Amino acid sequence: MAITQAVANVFKQELLKGNHNFIGATQNGTAAAYYLALYTSSATLGATTTAYSTGNEITNTAGTAYSAGGQVCGNPSVTGGASVATAYVDFDNVVWASASFTANGGLIYRQDSGGPTNDAVVVLAFGGDFTATNGTFTV
């Protein structure tokens, strides 16, 4: 089992269908937000990951800093244009205060009130376990 950093294949397809708009408050008439969920080293995530799942999602070793589903990725901004070969979206740092858990990677996914729901966007591999013990965990 491994977490392999990748843009999710399903995201590429859904992007071409017009199902992702990082800047708009709604997409296809439905409210949408992007979340970051964290996973243990037992998770298998990569390009073929299709959606958010609770399987091997992290849990708190103490306290309640982390909730299933993760946290909203706030204030997205899109960079790129005609003069550059790469475009990307950047979010504010996602921060868990008073955190006590270990994470090996994460999944950014779209959560909305209409279909498609919880579609994977990108898998983040941290390159190993990172642990917070009653401290701040920032991605």
Regions found by a protein language model. Give the residues of each.
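Small cysteine-rich, disulfide-bonded extracellular modules of the LU/uPAR three-finger superfamily
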Residues: 1-104, 110-139
